[in-house]
Amino acid sequence: MRFLSSLIILLIITIYSSVNGDIYMHSPPGSNNRNQEQGQNRDNNQRLFNSQNNDKGGYCRGEALEWYEKSYLPVEWTNQHGCGSGETECNIVIQYMCTDNAKAADTEYIRDGTVTTTISANDITQSSTKETNEYKFGMHESYHHYQNCTGRERNKGLFIANQNIGNNADRTRQSNNGNNYGYECQEERDYYPYWAPSPWKDVAIITDNRDLCKWYRSESQNVQPKYYCKAATTNNNQPRSIDPVICANQGGVWTKVDSHDIGAPECIKAEWTQVNTLGHVLEDGHNPMYNWSLPHSGMEPCIATGTCSCVLRVRYNISSSDLKGNGDEFTDYKSNGPKGATNVNDPNVVVAGQNVTLNINPNQYGRTFQDRSHVFSIIARPDSLKKAKIWNLLVKGKRGNIVQSHPAQEYQFVPKTLHIKVNEYIHYQWTGCDFNPQNYDGTGIKGSDRSNMCQIKTLNHNYPMTDDELNDDNALFADMETRLRFARLGQKSCLTYDELMTKNNNNKDAVEVDPQNCMVLNNAGTRFNGGVQKMSKTGSYYYMSTRNNNFSNRNQKGAIHVDPLLAGWQIGLIASGCSLFVIISATAGCVTFARFHPHSGMHRAVSKVPGLKRLV
């Protein structure tokens, strides 16, 4: 049965919450369960989801971003335990989900919330104040999804090591206490692909073993319907089975949930990343990254009406060759007996006739980490951009020096280096927040994130190009008004430096944090939307943030390379092909004429050419 085959899954499970672990999403900014708390650590690791990450990670919530449908969004992250290096078996699963603000019930509406407390059934409809409809408590998965999970029998064919786990799907090796993390289903979180219905839609699977790609793609709910046991009303207190036969015997109805019908996800080979480092890929020294082509209104109807609330999730799954999780050597609950190192804490093993102790916890043979974005919107394209190819350019990072910001990162543009074709478009947009720790290093009002963009000659320059140096041939932004908007972020009510000094009694420290000091962007909002700009000239353009680029301390620069539609070698190849075509056509014409005019001068000329004589 196809249902049973879907239970043969990878082990991507379990880690204690005390482990520093981890995957952190940097673009778009990953929350790691933060909201707008100002402490160094997040307030609540159970606010929306079970990340299993360090409490210090994550970016606080700024104003929500919105991107155009079918535009390209750079998804960047760092993962601590490596991938693609042969030292772990790993995959990274990128997923999203959206709800329609105009149609979703309170129990389904995706939102960030304004507090850090975990939602409960009594909190779903609460707003922050009587004056606003903004929800007080954050929520990603719906209450209905959570109810289905807590009322569903867990898959008892799974390896659980030496743990005694309850009967329901809200308990796994990795989370065995029944705590709720928002309305996330812990079993669905820990396993992929999952056998029960899920609201998450697959974007991509990035794996060290591409032999599994066909299976991943075919089992995705993007293309594969899922089933669950809809219980009779008299059976609500009994966990509903995941087996159709037992479901029927319980008086339930084996119920189909259609696929998302959006096409199978992409499955690609993981790039090499170092174990024990939140570092970069080997090939180009940048963070691991996936260019996500955002869904269109045919996939998410709320895009057409401008009423989408969406969230992005990236999960990082690692396991070991010591414990197989798929294929003929699939390890299931039968390995939970007393024998074997995979079921013993810190086992002693014999090496050269003597015991040595391994530093092993069997619960850590398979581990899942996770991060999620704050809520964002996907919007319809205007008529002028219907056929345009649009690349999104963001800012990642948070206030602080390299030590203070870690495991988040210092400010940087994303992508740092962008290659596009002439006449393609860039959507410049980024956000930050005002709730970083007050003592973190940075310019301007304490705790605040701000970034601007000014053109520089090369990446080795730290002074912006002057108006005299910019012209129609070399300017990233052709007109002065656009350059000013990207440099000053549209600030109003600004004071000159002399006015600021007078206002603050010549106290330079007070001038730096004065709200009317627009030179350090103090009067700008947390979000900047520079709009969509057409790149109509080829060339290379370099830029920096004047507020955050602090030479020898931190670097916030970027490069845009606008390439011709065809590379030089392609143009040469086409030219050569055209020349060859002309020569062949001319030769064929001469041969044809000579064949039908045997007494002509053309016939005599062609007959003297080796290889052509026999043709006439």
UniProtKB/Swiss-Prot annotation:
Positions on the Extracellular side per record topology: 22-563
Disruption phenotype: Displays down-regulation of regA, cAMP-dependent phosphodiesterase, and overexpression of protein tyrosine kinase during early development and its shutdown during late development.
Induction / repression: Down-regulated by phagocytic stimuli.
Intracellular or extracellular location(s): Membrane
Biased composition (Polar residues): 29-55
Topology feature Cytoplasmic, residues: 585-616
Topological category with respect to the lipid bilayer: Single-pass type I membrane protein
Source superkingdom: Eukaryota
Signal keyword on record: yes
Signal sequence interval, chain numbering: 1-21
Alphabetically ordered keywords of this record: Glycoprotein, Membrane, Signal, Transmembrane, Transmembrane helix
Region (Disordered): 27-55
Glycosylation sites recorded in the entry for this protein: N148, N291, N317, N355, N550
Annotated transmembrane regions: 564-584
Principal cellular location given in the protein's record: membrane
GO annotation, cellular component aspect: membrane
Function per UniProt: May participate in O-glycosylation.
Name of the protein described by the UniProt record: Protein DD3-3
Organism: Dictyostelium discoideum
Gene behind the chain: DD3-3
